[in-house]
Amino acid sequence: MKKRFQGAISLHSKGTEEFISPSDFGVSAIWKIRDFDITDCGGTAENIDMVGEAEMSCLNLEMMFDNGITIQDAFEDSPTINIAEYYDEIFTKNGEIRKSFLKNGVDELGLSTAGALHILQLVFIDSKYSGFNLVANVTKIYLENFARNTDLVFLQAFPLQHSEDTDLVKKATKIYRHDFTANSKETDIKRLAEHYKRIGFPRIGKTAHFFGTAESFRVGIERAMEN
């Protein structure tokens, strides 16, 4: 049965893996994972409903550069699924962003020596709350409150499809299902690609990944939420 949405989404962190020194713990130390409960806080304090879950990861660019770690090494040791294999779609051998990629819709893209690269791995909205454009709300809240210093943002459509964790696989395949109904994952991704393109995020080749600047996404998501 469809729930009545009260109109006030909130993200509650379920714990964070803190950054630690890569000199002691390897390249993977420059990544941080964030897990969130998505709640509807529009009702009374005694009536806060769970709406869904979200999972994000963050690459500390300042720590990466300070320790002489290349973006390629950082991608290869990413805790997220399938990031490393798409490196060549975005970067040259010198670590510069490909001009062919920039032509797909990202005009000005670069890695600063501070800030971060954020990856939106999973946003799962319970089917009872479908139809309220909550994915856009969740992403906007995350960028405004948890990713203010970010330079780049990844969006992944089906990030856990190769994971051995069957529960996560089942959850991941439900991403955006209620907003982008289709008969196959590929069709879902194509529809999602059209949606992301409208808000400033081009698809990376034929992969299930999308890429753009945080600022372009903020502008685009505002536009999408107005329509």
Regions inferred by a protein language model and the residue ranges of each:
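Non-catalytic substrate-recognition and accessory regions of acyl/acetyltransferase enzymes
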Residues: 1-130, 141-227
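A short glycine-leucine-enriched loop at secondary-structure breakpoints
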Residues: 132-134
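Hydrophobic positions on the alpha1 helix immediately C-terminal to the Walker A/P-loop
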Residues: 138
